[in-house]
Structures are given as structure tokens and as C-alpha cells.
Design a protein with these regions (language model features):
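Autoprocessing Asn-cyclization modules and mimics
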Residues: 82-178
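Acidic surface patches and DE-rich sequence motifs
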Residues: 4, 149, 229-230
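Short linear sequence signals and composition-biased patches located at protein termini or domain-edge surfaces
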Residues: 42-46, 50-100, 104, 111, ...
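Aliphatic-rich helix starts adjacent to a transmembrane/signal segment
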Residues: 2-59, 63-65, 261, 279-280
Length: 280
């Protein structure tokens, strides 16, 4: 009587092992491919998010440059001696701060939030209590302020702040609410804003009102500014007349931190921003 053996033979086991290795190899290859795709997408997403935040903040400062809470036609009194901040607002609301051409940008403007006044002298203003209950919530001693109406503006420094009153120096030629060329209801007070945008290392930084720089985005490997003057169709890093600048082109290169196939993800961005005080 013949005995029949059942089960796997050596050859069958070897074939099964080879097939298993092939399946495992294919699965590992798919895993590696997915991992590389994830790293590439993650790096690109971070770059795009950094660029979005950077351009949003830079654009806000450039658009506001040269502007106040009042008319763009407002000017200090003709007999008033301009200080450095007033001169900057009038003649160079955007500039390169004397740095190497195209490497830095400085923008000056009034703050976005401005407050109405109900009374004024040549060295103080009384704020509208229906708009702000305590002036200390908005201003502090040493703040640079813009006082303006539809006809004039001045940049002053706060010397004292109480519940409803802000005192300042230097004194204005006349009380802002008795200007015969502008109604008292148009008088506003806001903080003066001076910002400097620059690159340090691989970071994009902003310094506000002379304070230490704060990093806005990392991975910024290149940053440049170019300016278009009124009546021109070209952009240049060295404009011949800062008062005539009406738009700024911001070029930025961002590089990710993750490597894919031994290469880092890098993208170039460019955006053009107009100065509202010069174009509206």
C-alpha cells in the first residue's frame, strides 16, 4: 500500500517566500513614495503659508504708507518747521532707509485705528468718551501721535495721558479744533507708525517704531524691493524721487527645511502693492 504525503514542499515554500518578498518590496516602495510626496507637500504648504503671512503684513504697511486718518491733502501749517517724522510722511513715506538698494523697506503712516476728539488746545486733546472710555487703553507716554483734520496734520509725542486727555509736544501752531479751513468734527488722533522690513539670515523681520526686530517668516533666502514712480512703467531699486513712488514690487524666495530626493523645495514669489495715499 502506497503512503501519500501532504503539505508544502521546499520549492513551494521558496516560491512563497519570493512572492512575499516581492509584495513587501512593493509595499515599501509605495510607502517611500507616499512619504516623499507628503514631505514635498508639507514643505510646499509651509512655504505658501509663510509667503501668505509675509505678503499680507508687508502689503498692509505699504498700502497705508503716507496716509493719515484724515485727508491725503492735509499738510502742516506753512509757518511750521517740519520735524523728521512729518518730513518722512510728506517726502518719503516709503524708502530704503539708506541701506543697500532694494534690500530694506521703511514705511511711515498713521495707525489703522484713530479716535475723534471733543476739545483741543495747542498742546493737548480731549478724546470722545463715547468712542474710547480711557485714553490709557490706546496711548502711553512717549508714543508718537498724528493729529490731523481735513486741512492739516502734525506728528507729536505724548507727554501725559489721563482718562480722556492726551498732552503732547511740540505744540501745534493753533488748536486743531479751531482751524477755519476744517470743521472740528474732522479732527482725529492716532499713533504714528514707522516700520522697517528686512531680511536677516534666512528670516524676514519687521521693526516697528524703532523697536527690536520680530521674525515674521523663516526660510526667506532672498528679499528685494523695487519701486515704480508716477508716470513710469518700470520698477527700480533706486528711484530718483521718493515722493513720486506710487507702487512697490516685493520679490521673495522661500526655501523649505525638508529635503526630497536630496533637494529642498524652493519657490519664488512676487507681488506689486500700490500706495493708497498716492493713487487714490
Amino acid at each position: 500500500m502506497r503512503t501519500t504525503q501532504s503539505g508544502f514542499g521546499l520549492i513551494e515554500l521558496m516560491i512563497a517566500m519570493v512572492l512575499g518578498l516581492l509584495v513587501m518590496g512593493a509595499a515599501f516602495a509605495v510607502f517611500q513614495s507616499n512619504q516623499r510626496s507628503f514631505q514635498a507637500n508639507e514643505g510646499l504648504n509651509r512655504i505658501q503659508e509663510s509667503a501668505r503671512v509675509a505678503y499680507e503684513l508687508i502689503s498692509r504697511d505699504i498700502r497705508a504708507a503716507g496716509g493719515t486718518a484724515c485727508s491725503n491733502l492735509a499738510r502742516p501749517d506753512a509757518e511750521h518747521t517740519l520735524n523728521a517724522d512729518e518730513t518722512q510722511l510728506l517726502t518719503a513715506p516709503v524708502s530704503d532707509n539708506g541701506a543697500a538698494a532694494g534690500t530694506e523697506l521703511v514705511a511711515a503712516s498713521g495707525d489703522d485705528t484713530a479716535y475723534r476728539i471733543t476739545g483741543a488746545t495747542t498742546n493737548s486733546v480731549t478724546l470722545d468718551s463715547t468712542q474710547i472710555a480711557d485714553a490709557n487703553d490706546a496711548f502711553k507716554v512717549g508714543d508718537k501721535l498724528i493729529l490731523c483734520n481735513a486741512n492739516q496734520f502734525y506728528v507729536v509725542t505724548a507727554t501725559a495721558v489721563s482718562t480722556n486727555t492726551v498732552s503732547f509736544s511740540p505744540a501745534t501752531p493753533v488748536a486743531m479744533n479751531v482751524d477755519p479751513m476744517a470743521p472740528p468734527a474732522t479732527v482725529m488722533v492716532a499713533r504714528f507708525r514707522n516700520v522697517r522690513w528686512y531680511r536677516s539670515g534666512n528670516g524676514l523681520y519687521v521693526s516697528r517704531n524703532g523697536a527690536a526686530g520680530q521674525q515674521v517668516a523663516d526660510g526667506v533666502t532672498a528679499l528685494s524691493f523695487a519701486y515704480r514712480q508716477n508716470g513710469s512703467n518700470t520698477y527700480t531699486a533706486t528711484p530718483t524721487s521718493w515722493p513720486d513712488v506710487v507702487a512697490v514690487r516685493v520679490n521673495m524666495t522661500l526655501t523649505g527645511t525638508n529635503q526630497v530626493d536630496n533637494k529642498t523645495v524652493s519657490r519664488n514669489f512676487s507681488n506689486v502693492i500700490s500706495l493708497r495715499s498716492r493713487t487714490l
